[in-house]
């Protein structure tokens, strides 16, 4: 259903047709309010707005900064995560080389927390010229390391935005990414409840991922239930 939103990582065909077909055939939908927004999608130029910027950028040391240059994620650590995420830049940076003895950087909070934080910064007037925030890896790693670890991101920004991420920060913002809700199915077979002969697999099916899908799980969901269907 990503194309229902102004900004999405979904392809052109993500229009919710599968959900509508099942509903019209007598099927049931559940959990359609559970929609996942990936915190880092491209925001410029308009033709590529919403394309994913992989979490590997943050996992390899990239940090989020607002238009004032401030590393703002330290302001958005929920109380429930205080014991697991660093509250200083020094500890957060140490985690990359000593994860056993330091807490994680707040840039690696769950996707929904990071997306809300970015949205809050933009709404507060601390966003980039194109309505996002800065994701910076250029000041964190040598250029040759960036090109080796993040070749697809280097190519993506160079080709689509004329930005060299080894020298410049990226502009990123939340993008509609995945809907956890969908057609109510039998959890063992993928058969749509109430509609004999109808099966749903992948993102069109609901309930497999609760209220917040874990990264990578959608692939196993699609393969397992696609095969069963």
Question: Which positions does each model-derived feature cover?
Answer:
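Generic beta-strand/beta-sheet core signal
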Residues: 32-35, 67, 74-75, 136, ...
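Short, small/polar residue-rich loop motifs at catalytic or cofactor-binding pockets
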Residues: 57-59, 177-179, 216
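Glycine-rich loop(s) and the adjacent beta-strand/alpha-helix scaffold that form part
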Residues: 1-47, 51, 83, 217-228
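Catalytic phosphate/nucleotide-handling subdomain of diverse soluble enzymes
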Residues: 193-229
């Amino acid at each position: 259903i990503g194309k229902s939103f102004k900004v999405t990582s979904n392809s052109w065909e993500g229009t919710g047709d599968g959900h509508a077909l099942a509903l019209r055939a007598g099927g049931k939908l559940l959990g359609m309010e559970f929609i996942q927004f990936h915190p880092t999608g491209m925001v410029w130029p308009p033709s590529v707005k919403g394309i994913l910027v992989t979490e590997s950028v943050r996992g390899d040391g990239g940090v989020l900064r607002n238009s004032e240059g401030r590393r703002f994620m330290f302001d958005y650590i929920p109380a429930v995560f205080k014991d697991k995420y660093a509250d200083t830049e020094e500890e957060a940076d140490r985690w990359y080389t000593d994860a056993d003895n330091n807490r994680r950087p707040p840039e690696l909070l769950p996707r929904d927390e990071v997306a809300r934080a970015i949205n809050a910064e933009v709404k507060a007037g601390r966003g980039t010229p194109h309505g996002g925030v800065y994701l910076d890896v250029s000041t964190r790693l040598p250029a040759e390391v960036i090109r080796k670890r993040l070749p697809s991101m280097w190519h993506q920004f160079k080709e689509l935005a004329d930005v060299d991420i080894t020298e410049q920060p990226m502009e990123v913002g939340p993008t509609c990414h995945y809907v956890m809700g969908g057609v109510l199915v039998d959890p063992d077979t993928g058969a749509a409840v109430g509609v004999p002969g109808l099966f749903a697999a992948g993102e069109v099916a609901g309930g497999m991922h609760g209220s917040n899908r874990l990264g990578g799980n959608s692939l196993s969901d699609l393969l397992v239930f696609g095969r069963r269907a």
